């Protein structure tokens, strides 16, 4: 039974495509603007764009809650909220901390943007095209995470850690403790997500090898 294809202009494919465009723009800024202005000027010129693009992921929580997608709600909330904490809780509320003004901000944007460009384009192709995503996109989706996931998480943790003292002095001890609790949540959260991707990769690579073998016969 063939899968039901969606129109490119229907909500879910369009959301994925626009999200890919948004992250592509951020990657373009890293490549084109950062070498010209450096840090911390680059952070101040791009933090609002990064916040806006990342906040678009709130729609993923809504989609999961309504059953529009099959992603588990708790997993989606955990993934999105950790990033929202960074863009809203640090970029917007604590913009003068050392983490976001350093090269760590660049490594964060590179890890986030490349990951999301590939992910959203993968979803778009899977929804719209009969043959699904191009093989190169599948390979990128299930191999880049080896480098990009640890890089992104390490960058997030560094940015949060550098904001701890400012969180207490500018807001309250409670806010500092919230940030610490968020950091501790990465201990079970990251291995769980990473191992899930490893398991998914194993299935996908096996399927690709099987498909490639059939074409040779």
From Swiss-Prot:
Protein name: Very-long-chain (3R)-3-hydroxyacyl-CoA dehydratase PHS1
UniProt motif (Endoplasmic reticulum retention signal) ranges: 214-217
InterPro entries: Tyr_Pase-like_PTPLA
Keyword Endoplasmic reticulum assigned: yes
Primary residence: endoplasmic reticulum
Annotated consequence of substituting residue 79 to A: Digitonin sensitive, reduces structural integrity of the protein
Encoding gene (name): PHS1
Keywords, sorted A to Z: Endoplasmic reticulum, Fatty acid biosynthesis, Fatty acid metabolism, Lipid biosynthesis, Lipid metabolism, Lyase, Membrane, Transmembrane, Transmembrane helix, Vacuole
Protein family membership: Belongs to the very long-chain fatty acids dehydratase HACD family.
Organism: Saccharomyces cerevisiae (strain ATCC 204508 / S288c) (Baker's yeast)
Effect of residue 149 to A: No catalytic activity
Phenotypic consequence of residue 60 to A: Digitonin sensitive, reduces structural integrity of the protein. Affects the substrate specificity
Membrane topology recorded in Swiss-Prot or TrEMBL: Multi-pass membrane protein
